[in-house]
């Protein structure tokens, strides 16, 4: 049976039209995976095998990854934006949100993300999997080099900026035309799989879900960008805490988590509720059955497997 799809603007489009748009998304994600995700692995292997003997190994690998992160993110998602006719200016506009709302959103975000990161780390240890505690899409850190301004700039500012542009500014905004629930879930799944480490799967899902809901609530990526940057900065701050004082970090995270739970069940956490619908469920099935989307997701899974096996 052939279905027509109802878009958010009440316009009805054919299944072939939707297939073409979803195929473009899949192809863009494939390009993103091949350039942004696999380039660091290729650079590391090439440098370690002496193909560039005159260059310092870590620096060269990072420079190649840095360039790939920018090009591989901007180019494919620019294609998606043009095909969908997505107005990025509308999603980068100022919002009617005050400082108290920013702080509430951040406490909820970081409380749940930090707790998820801690739980996921325990699970990976029980499974005997060597997890990378802190990483970001495209560039993986075996440890946060807090004495390196370039690493810090990338982790705290560049990665959040590119991720919010790509996943919330372009992908979420574009897919929202077929329903907010559909866009929320698909963006969250893609964002989760795009992360490199098994030890980040649960926190990445929490991050993607909360940042996407925040963006849909305020119809702008500014709140999510601010929250993302502050979250990464605080993670770097935790990296500075000596191991013998790590108990204080856990206590701080526990307090934030309790406060986050209280805020969620109070009326102060003003995040919209997004329910599923038959059209969203149909769009999800159609999206996940697209061959290009499937290949892109498999590339993400393959990358995670390689990272785990190679202990990159």
Predicted regions and their residues:
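Alpha-helical transmembrane spans of integral membrane proteins, capturing the lipid-embedded, hydrophobic core
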Residues: 25-40, 66-74, 102-114, 118, ...
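Alpha-helical transmembrane segments in multi-pass membrane proteins
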Residues: 33-83, 249-255
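Transmembrane helix-loop-helix hairpins at the membrane interface
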Residues: 149-308, 312
């Amino acid at each position: 049976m052939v279905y027509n799809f109802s878009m958010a603007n009440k316009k009805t489009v054919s299944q072939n039209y939707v297939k073409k748009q979803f195929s473009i998304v899949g192809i863009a994600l494939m390009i993103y995976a091949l350039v942004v995700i696999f380039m660091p692995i290729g650079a590391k292997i090439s440098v370690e095998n002496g193909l560039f003997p005159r260059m310092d190994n870590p620096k060269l690998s990072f420079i190649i990854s840095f360039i790939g992160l920018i090009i591989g993110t901007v180019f494919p998602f620019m294609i998606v934006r043009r095909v969908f006719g997505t107005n990025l200016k509308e999603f980068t506009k100022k919002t009617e949100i005050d400082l108290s709302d920013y702080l509430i959103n951040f406490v909820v975000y970081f409380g749940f993300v930090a707790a998820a990161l801690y739980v996921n780390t325990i699970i990976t240890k029980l499974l005997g999997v060597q997890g990378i505690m802190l990483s970001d899409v495209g560039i993986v850190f075996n440890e946060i080099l807090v004495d390196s301004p370039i690493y810090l700039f990338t982790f705290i500012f560049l990665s959040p900026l590119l991720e919010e542009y790509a996943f919330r500014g372009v992908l979420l905004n574009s897919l929202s035309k077929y329903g907010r629930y559909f866009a929320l879930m698909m963006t969250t799944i893609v964002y989760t799989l795009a992360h490199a480490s098994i030890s980040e799967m649960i926190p990445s899902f929490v991050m993607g879900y909360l940042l996407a809901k925040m963006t849909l609530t305020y119809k702008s990526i500014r709140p999510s960008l601010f929250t993302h940057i502050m979250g990464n900065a605080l993670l770097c701050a935790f990296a500075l805490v000596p191991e013998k004082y790590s108990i204080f970090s856990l206590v701080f995270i526990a307090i934030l988590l309790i406060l986050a739970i209280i805020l969620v069940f109070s009326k102060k956490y003003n995040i919209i509720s997004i329910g599923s619908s038959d059209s969203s469920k149909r769009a999800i099935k159609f999206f996940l059955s697209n061959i290009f989307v499937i290949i892109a997701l498999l590339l993400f899974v393959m990358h995670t497997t390689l990272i785990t096996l190679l202990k990159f």
